[in-house]
């Protein structure tokens, strides 16, 4: 207790001396982008290294300065040093990333903080996007209206405003409701015991933030397990001892080099932020893949469902799939390269079907972002063969309800031979049996007569027209989709009919899948009828 009192009195009386003699130093802690492990930011933190008392912890000097209304002097000193550092780096051609500084409630009450910040950024010619303002929810206990006006002013001229320690207090959600923030810094005390409940809270926070357009950063990350969890739920940025503790600038720089962490440029930041806009919390098959200048592919994210498909064809992890895809003579690589040549030149998704170990896989890819010859891609992968096997097993087990949640039919069609071969038929047709080959035209007409509602048959016949299918598939990247009311054990319901071209066949061989589209209710039917009346104008 006596030491604490002595330090408090010492700090109050020696602040000016600490500034002039360099006892107070700025330490920088790296902020890492989760999907790329690139350096995307730094936080500036005050450290007091005293000749009398040694290394003072922040909680040994900040409360004393706050109680004596001197804290604004410390914050402005840190701001000045950060601006000096940024200007020196810019002048020397050293890559820079945005640096965040902490402002306290006292800064807003004891000085014109906006003018003070502007004065220094103008003095050192610092672009506003390189400086981020961190505040805590305690800022809004009093004078909330005046503080909000100042924060809005910061944002209007290009500074980012972040909420620090989100979740550590009791009014975080109220602050989010009433104020505009560019980023949330999530307090990792949530994960101190790493229970499922704490994970669920973090995941919900990430999902909410993406929905309202706020970026996320988790601070206090210390383990590989925490990092992987946060990356996989879509938390964009990571800060903590796992990637590096706060250090003087030159030591921090050396640490980053030693860890082989690349520094983001402004262009790279904008590029990766396109992926950060996506919601990773999905049960669907989803992957984010990056293709580099040398043509190699790297998984930046893969959902459990996507990894499950990879494992079904002998790639237990995304890294194993990378190795297969990046082999120069890999036939799969060549097929996917042809697909990507279309994806790179368009904002539309493209899809192919290919085989691995006698299993049909369907891959859909869409461009998210481009930086020169680097691309971020959104991918969806399905194992059609395995799904078909699951369907057949469900039939054996009598699981009709689950069965109809998957596929009504899967058929392989060969236009050159004029044949079709059912892989799956969920209903029992005495004329069509999986594993047998039939005439395409005869089957198409019979299926239309038996299974398509009368009013939809003209559209169905145009959709199934063998003379135009190849051209239509080619024009739409290898996939076509349409909706028809199709007969099921529950009567006629809206089903999605999809054509998927088999690669290297000039769209002459394709899969035809049929699956229920939406719940069969009157309101939705009326909506679809209206939609189709509009679509008919383009036929």
Please name every model-derived segment.
Residues 171, 387-399, 521-539:
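Sensory-domain boundary/capping and coupling elements
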Residues 39, 50, 246, 361-380, ...:
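Short loop/turn elements at sensory-signaling interfaces that couple input to output
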Residues 34-43, 70-147, 220:
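Catalytic core of bacterial c-di-GMP phosphodiesterases, primarily the EAL and HD-GYP domains
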Residues 1-25, 65-69, 107-114, 147, ...:
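C-di-GMP signaling machinery
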Residues 3-64, 102, 163, 218, ...:
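Active-site core of bacterial EAL-family cyclic-dinucleotide phosphodiesterase domains
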Residues 118-193, 208, 212-245, 531-533:
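The catalytic core of metal-dependent phosphodiesterases that act on cyclic dinucleotides
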Residues 291-346, 420-478:
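PAS-family sensory domains
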Residues 1-7, 14, 43, 60, ...:
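Cyclic nucleotide signaling catalytic output domains
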């Amino acid at each position: 207790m006596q030491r604490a009192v002595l330090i408090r009195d010492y700090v109050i009386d020696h602040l000016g001396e600490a500034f002039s003699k360099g006892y107070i130093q700025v330490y920088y802690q790296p902020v890492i982008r989760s999907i790329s492990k690139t350096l995307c930011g730094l936080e500036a933190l005050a450290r007091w290294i005293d000749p009398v008392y040694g290394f003072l912890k922040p909680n040994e000097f900040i409360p004393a300065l706050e109680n004596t209304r001197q804290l604004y002097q410390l914050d402005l000193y840190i701001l000045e040093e950060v601006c000096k550092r940024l200007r020196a780096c810019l002048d020397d051609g050293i890559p820079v990333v945005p640096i965040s500084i902490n402002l306290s409630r006292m800064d807003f009450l004891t000085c014109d903080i906006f003018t003070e910040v502007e004065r220094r950024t103008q003095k050192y010619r610092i672009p506003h996007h390189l400086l981020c303002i961190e505040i805590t929810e305690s800022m809004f206990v009093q004078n909330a209206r005046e503080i909000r006006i100042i924060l809005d002013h910061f944002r209007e001229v290009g500074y980012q405003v972040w909420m620090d320690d989100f979740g550590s207090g009791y009014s975080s959600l109220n602050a989010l409701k009433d104020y505009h923030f560019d980023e949330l810094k999530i307090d990792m005390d949530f994960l101190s015991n790493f229970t499922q409940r704490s994970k669920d809270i973090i995941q919900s926070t990430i999902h909410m933030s993406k929905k309202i357009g706020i970026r996320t950063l988790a601070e206090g990350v210390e383990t590989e397990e925490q990092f992987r969890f946060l990356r996989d739920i879509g938390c964009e940025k990571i800060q903590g001892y796992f990637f590096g503790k706060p250090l003087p600038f030159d030591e921090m720089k050396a640490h980053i080099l030693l860890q082989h962490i690349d520094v983001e440029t402004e262009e790279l930041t904008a590029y990766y932020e396109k992926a950060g806009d996506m919601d990773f919390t999905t049960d669907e098959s989803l992957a984010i893949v990056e293709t580099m200048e040398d043509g190699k592919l790297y998984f930046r994210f893969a959902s459990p469902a996507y990894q499950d498909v990879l494992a079904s064809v002998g790639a237990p992890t995304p890294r194993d799939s990378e190795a297969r895809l990046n082999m120069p003579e890999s036939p799969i690589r060549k097929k996917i390269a042809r697909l990507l040549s279309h994806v790179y030149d368009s904002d539309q998704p493209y899809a192919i079907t290919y085989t691995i170990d006698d299993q049909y896989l369907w891959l859909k890819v869409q461009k998210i972002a481009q930086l020169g010859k680097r691309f971020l891609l959104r991918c969806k992968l399905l194992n059609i063969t395995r799904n078909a096997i699951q369907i057949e097993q469900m039939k054996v087990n009598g699981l009709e309800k689950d069965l109809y949640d998957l596929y009504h039919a899967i058929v392989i069609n060969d236009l050159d031979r004029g044949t079709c071969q059912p892989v799956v038929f969920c209903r029992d047709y005495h004329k069509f049996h999986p594993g047998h080959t039939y005439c395409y035209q005869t089957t198409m007409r019979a299926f239309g007569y038996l299974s398509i509602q009368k009013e939809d048959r003209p559209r169905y016949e145009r959709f199934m027209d063998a003379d135009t299918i190849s051209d239509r598939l080619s024009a739409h990247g290898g996939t076509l989709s349409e909706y028809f009311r199709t007969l099921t054990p529950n009567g006629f319901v809206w089903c999605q009919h999809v054509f998927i071209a088999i690669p290297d066949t000039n769209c002459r061989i394709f899969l035809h899948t049929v699956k229920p589209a939406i719940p069969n209710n009157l309101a939705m039917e009326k909506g679809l009828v209206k939609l189709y009346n509009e679509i008919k104008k383009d036929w």
